[in-house]
């Protein structure tokens, strides 16, 4: 029997974080020269999404490690 408390994988774990994620998305898209929209290629959108993930992981590592993280580049 499925657990009705399971969250969708697309739901944010922190309520109110959507605005910060959206801001990060548009900042990264601008840095990469990507105009987000329906005509943007999956590859371009994926590069933005991948960079968001990379930066969020780096931020989490810094918090967990007391600010000591390696560069992901």
Curated annotation (Swiss-Prot):
Family assignment from sequence similarity: Belongs to the alpha/beta-type SASP family.
Marked site positions, Cleavage: 27-28
GO BP term, example: sporulation resulting in formation of a cellular spore
Function text: SASP are bound to spore DNA. They are double-stranded DNA-binding proteins that cause DNA to change to an a-like conformation. They protect the DNA backbone from chemical and enzymatic cleavage and are thus involved in dormant spore's high resistance to UV light.
GO molecular function: double-stranded DNA binding
DNA-binding keyword on record: yes
PANTHER family: SMALL, ACID-SOLUBLE SPORE PROTEIN A
Keyword set, alphabetical order: DNA-binding, Sporulation
InterPro entries: SASP_alpha/beta-type (IPR001448), SASP_alpha/beta-type_CS (IPR018126), SASP_DNA-binding (IPR050847), SASP_sf_alpha/beta (IPR038300)
Note from the entry: SASP are degraded in the first minutes of spore germination and provide amino acids for both new protein synthesis and metabolism.
Protein name: Small, acid-soluble spore protein C5
């Amino acid at each position: 029997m499925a657990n009705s408390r399971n969250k969708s994988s697309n739901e944010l774990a922190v309520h109110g974080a959507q605005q910060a994620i959206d801001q990060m998305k548009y900042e990264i898209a601008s840095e990469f020269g990507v105009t987000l929209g329906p005509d943007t290629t999956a590859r371009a959108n994926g590069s933005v999404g991948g960079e968001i993930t990379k930066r969020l992981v780096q931020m989490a590592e810094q918090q967990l490690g007391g600010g000591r993280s390696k560069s992901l580049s």
